[in-house]
Amino acid sequence: VRQLLYPRECPFCGRVLGDVRDCPDCAVQLETLRRKPGIRLDPAQHYISNLAGAAAPYRYSGCVRRGILNAKYQGKPWRAVEMGNRLVQLAFGGELTVQYGELLPQPVPWAAIGYDLIVPVPASGKRRGYNVPELMALPLAKAMEVPLAPQALERTRAKRHQAGLPLEQRIANVAGAFRAAQPQQLEGKRILLVDDVITTGTTAAACAQALLH
């Protein structure tokens, strides 16, 4: 019944997929958008201070960009969950299977060795009623068997949109914009920080700074 009422869609183009795991329309473009030779970001090209490392499976362009924008601004939160499934697969080598029209990540408990907690970057506003990074983190938490802590970080103030700003202004824009809600519960924890988009890395670095202090 669920599959008939809410058929599974491609998170990038919206095509109804049903029991088909991967969208044939987006497969070729997604392959061209894959970061190669690996998904880890170069610290020389990104501002990722305070982070042990950072990774992004795809470049923010084409169908990937459209999928994220639709999830954020077109009221399609389930697309964020689907993209989170791709993170399980591409970042941690997890297997994905389709059961009754739903894409499900298989457990990857070995990955839990590296993290004690998964923390999504908090939403910039409450208008949409959901937080895309949190939804993307749900499949990761399930597959890795690591607790998800959506309230660990909170924003202290609104910030300007980062798009189009030079690096110096991006750094200033997010400076002090986040704080750890319950720092005593984070002490000594190995944290996986999840965001929907990383360009220069300034937002992730500001979140890491808040978690560390």
Report residues per predicted region.
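Glycine-rich phosphate/pyrophosphate-handling loop used in enzymes and phosphotransfer proteins
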Residues: 1-213
